[in-house]
Amino acid sequence: MTDLGIVASGVRRSFGAVQAVREVNLEARAGAVTGLVGPNGSGKTTLLLMLASLLAPDAGTIRIGGIDPVAQPDAARAILGWMPDALGAWPSLTARETLVMTSRLYGLDAAAAAGGAARLLAEVGLTHLADAPARVLSRGQKQRLGLARALVHDPRVLLLDEPASGLDPQARIDLRVLLRRLAAEGRTILISSHILSELEEVVDDAVFLVEGATVSSDRVAAAATRRRTWRIRLADREPVAAVLPVAQALGLDAALIPIDRRDLLVGFAGDAEAASALAALVSAGLPVAEFAAATGLLEHTFLDLEGGRA
């Protein structure tokens, strides 16, 4: 596929006196999964609706694979797969009929629509429910059907709003594998999710949205590198007994090391300092059973940005 992606510059959108999107500037690369991260009410869904050509911005420009979705909505939709948070399917149609109908609306002939529906149902693990009405599907099953529906016309760009919502652990793993494969095929994928631990395992890049505006790369970088808490657990003793030897090995005050269940919590200013601490623990002969960041980098950055809001 050609090097297509998503570009938004100076995008704004208001609803009456409410500024849902104040100033959005973002790029999503082809062949990569980009995460759209922000709290409730930050404007993520409004932004996705504008990118999907379903809502016009008040100001700014949007390009989907080089196409302006405001001036050329049909051309943009031809290369765009949109998965909203809620399925919005025809409740009386079966899962198979939903995909066939959507394919036909995109101009596929009957044979291609039927074949594509069968393939996509298998890819999202719904073959056994192919002939079940959409209304009887669970929340997670509807999410999988929504993803399949977004893929019926082999789009180059995917916009996914909370695709992991309602999925069980195995289905989430399957979703990650599928998204990585789709990105490897050259697609541009922009995904919004509140499940930051899941998002971290699939994204290549992240865009942070706070109070309707994208956060500058400098501010994101500063947040990502601030002091971060790590979990430490020794294999041969309980946490209370581990505090003193860990503190001595790291040159810390034992009274300042908190305990969370089986782990000690220690803050380090970056990965290099954490790596040096691990080396010090091992050199001191301590049997380290766990040494890991307490939160993922996405969550750490998000929480730091949230804490820094005015």
Residue ranges and their predicted role:
Residues 154:
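Conserved catalytic motifs of ABC-family nucleotide-binding domains
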Residues 176-268:
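ABC transporter nucleotide-binding domain
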Residues 52:
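Helix-to-loop junction immediately C-terminal to a conserved catalytic motif
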Residues 92, 133-137:
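Conserved ABC ATPase signature
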Residues 100, 104, 111-129:
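Conserved ABC ATPase "signature" region
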Residues 158-162:
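Catalytic Walker B motif of ABC-type/P-loop ATPase nucleotide-binding domains
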Residues 60-68, 75-76:
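Conserved ABC transporter NBD signature motif
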